[in-house]
Amino acid sequence: MRTQGQQISDRLTVEVDCHSLGPADCPSMTSSFSPLESPTPTPTSLYSHGSLTSPSWHEAGHYHSLPMERRPSGTPLRNAFRVTDFPSADPMGMQVGTMERPDQLPVSSEYLSGYDDINDQLWIPHDSIPKTFEHPTFPYQAPMPQYHHTMGRNHYYRPQAHTAYLPESASNPCLSRPMFSRHDGLSHSASMSNMLPWMTAPESLAPQTITPQQAFPGAGPVTPPSSNYSDFPASLQTFKPHTPSTPVRSLSLGTPRSDTPQSRMSGHYDYSEEYPVSPVYRDGHLIRTHRQPSRKPSKKQLVRSNLSLEKLPPIIKQVQFKCKEPGCKGRFKRQEHLKRHMKSHSKEKPHVCWVPGCHRAFSRSDNLNAHYTKTHSKRGGRNRYVATLDETSPDYDPEFRGQLTPDGRPIYGSKLEDLADCDLSVDGWED
């Protein structure tokens, strides 16, 4: 066994008690391997809190890059894992071994299901254990595991079981302290190698080496940043946000347009209204494109070009029938309308009002009927009221011809010739 005086900050000692065998039979059972190379990336602080009982160990006959040999034996072994008291690099100066932890954990088929026979001896060569990350400033930094597709029998990957025991600072390398230290002695490629497995799902990509130039093209060499956040790598500013190049049309008019692919897709070739195209961003630069006026005339222009005074039909047609009386400007569309108008200019008025005291004559019968309804059917007018011409009166009888009472009611049985004072002179007639 190694002494506790040695500064072994990344070793986990495996002690195997062989009570039934002699010391010469199992000289190589006491060995040490790095927990950083285990399939579960568990930091030192995780083992100090008694979380060793839960990691899912490989159920195959070998670890990746860690060969094992099986030596059959007839005597059963009582194997146990023991966490030794090794100093931690925590700034608080706390010893890991002084914290509460299980002293012994029996190794059974539950943890090493690849070994069905518990009588076999587990031997790990001391020279085959890789020695990585022995720098004293990386007590909590653990490389992300690289899972190979050539696993042994009964092995399957359980990602939820691994992430349940990892704190946020261990699973996310961007939050660990050594990445922001300028004295850590690591280059930018080493930091990027720890970030890339965390950024990519392990089950979706095969293990491969990705350089920073392949992951971030055009960024150039970047030096490790300092502890303050103001000196963050300037290469992140080279990443430009992606903006859609599809133009958005506005409703303003009067802007010239050009024959662009966007205009071909829109299909607005037959209109003269111009729609400006929104700015297009290409490689982070603003590119303004304007449309030029199309040469094809629009529909409105074609309609306006056909409108002229010579081609327009007359709004009012020329009236063919005119009144021939001098001084009369009567115009009529029909011949019968002109004949009826000509009767108004003649001296013949055969249609005379029968109301006693009126005796007004008209050349047309329709004019006489209008005279009855407008003048004699209303009370309080300057003409005499006749109840037989009023539609609202109970004595309404448009066919009555006879004598009337002073209030305009009819006197049935009387005749118009019986009136002695009836004046039928022509002077009383009105045109």
UniProtKB/Swiss-Prot annotation:
> Tell me, what's a Pfam family for it?
zf-C2H2
**Cell inner membrane: is it a keyword of this entry?**
no
InterPro entries under this entry?
Znf_C2H2_sf, Znf_C2H2_type
Q: Name one GO cellular component term.
A: nucleus
Q: What induces it?
A: Expression is controlled by the casein kinase CK2.
* Record's subcellular location: Nucleus
Which stretches does UniProt call biased (Polar residues)? 225-265
Question: What happens when the protein's gene is inactivated?
Answer: Blocks conidia formation and increases hyphal branching. Affects the expression of seven secondary metabolism gene clusters including those in the biosynthesis of roquefortine C and meleagrin, and up-regulates the expression levels of most cellulase genes.
Where is the segment annotated Disordered?
29-51, 211-275, 287-306, 390-412
Q: Which domain of life is it from?
A: Eukaryota
Q: Where is the composition biased (Low complexity)?
A: 30-48
Kindly list the GO molecular function terms attached to this UniProt entry.
DNA-binding transcription factor activity, RNA polymerase II-specific; RNA polymerase II cis-regulatory region sequence-specific DNA binding; zinc ion binding
- What keywords is this UniProt entry annotated with? Activator, Conidiation, DNA-binding, Metal-binding, Nucleus, Repeat, Sporulation, Transcription, Transcription regulation, Zinc, Zinc-finger
According to its UniProt entry, the function of this protein is described as: BrlA, abaA and wetA are pivotal regulators of conidiophore development and conidium maturation. They act individually and together to regulate their own expression and that of numerous other sporulation-specific genes. Binds promoters of target genes at brlA response elements (BREs) containing the conserved sequence 5'-(C/A)(A/G)AGGG(G/A)-3'. Regulates the expression levels of seven secondary metabolism gene clusters including a down-regulated cluster putatively involved in the biosynthesis of the mycotoxins roquefortine C and meleagrin. Negatively regulates the expression of cellulase genes.
Return the protein name.
C2H2 type master regulator of conidiophore development brlA
Gene source species:
Penicillium oxalicum (strain 114-2 / CGMCC 5302)
